[in-house]
Amino acid sequence: MGTARFLSAVLLLSVPLMVTFPALLSAEYHDGRVDICSLPSDSGDCLRFFEMWYFDGTTCTKFVYGGYGGNDNRFPTEKACMKRCAKA
């Protein structure tokens, strides 16, 4: 019984890594750091409804954020998104 609980806990705790790791593989890196503007949109893990903005590689696009999790390609306004991600 203890082993089954342990394995269930390990599996449950590894789910966020299974979701996050592929996104990091597809991201671009600059000076060893992830370029957040190259990350895909990620609505997160919760079911709340926040209108946010992400950079899609060309422009800033609105998406729904659930309120928890996700990645850093998430901005409260289009202006903040463009300021951080748009290339001059």
Curated annotation (Swiss-Prot):
The record marks L39 as: May bind Kv1. InterPro entries: Kunitz_BPTI, Kunitz_BPTI_sf, Serpin_venom_toxin. GO terms for biological process: envenomation resulting in negative regulation of voltage-gated potassium channel activity in another organism. The keyword Metal-binding does not apply. Gene3D superfamilies: Pancreatic trypsin inhibitor Kunitz domain. It comes from the Eukaryota. Serine protease inhibitor that inhibits trypsin at a molar ratio of 1:1. This is Kunitz-type U15-theraphotoxin-Hs1a. It comes from Cyriopagopus schmidti. The lineage of its organism: Eukaryota, Metazoa, Ecdysozoa, Arthropoda, Chelicerata.
